[in-house]
Amino acid sequence: MKRYQFTDADSSWQLDEIYIRVNGKWFYLYRAINKHGTTLDFYFSPKRNKNTAYPFIKRVLKTYSVERQPKILNTDKHSSYGYAITRLMKEGKDTRCCKAAASQIPE
């Protein structure tokens, strides 16, 4: 079974990353979270850059059908998200972005 089958998508998602230590090594944990605080998808990466944000956002959007994708992606204004969203829009994805502080995301 796929993890998203039991998770409802909402009209807006929060995209966030946090720097965590796993087995003595530091990684960025990228997360897509709905308005209820449920993690929709996640991705571990040793780097925080546009080459990491783009495949993560593309993967999480691809997981859901167009009807279930969010109208708004809230981010913490890191430049990697701007690049990723702009690139997705150029590829024909209908993604609207509202940049907002992600400090309200539960950890």
UniProtKB/Swiss-Prot annotation:
It comes from the Bacteria. Keywords: Plasmid. InterPro entries: DDE_dom, IS_Transposase. Pfam families: DDE_Tnp_IS240 (PF13610). This is Uncharacterized protein pYV0051.
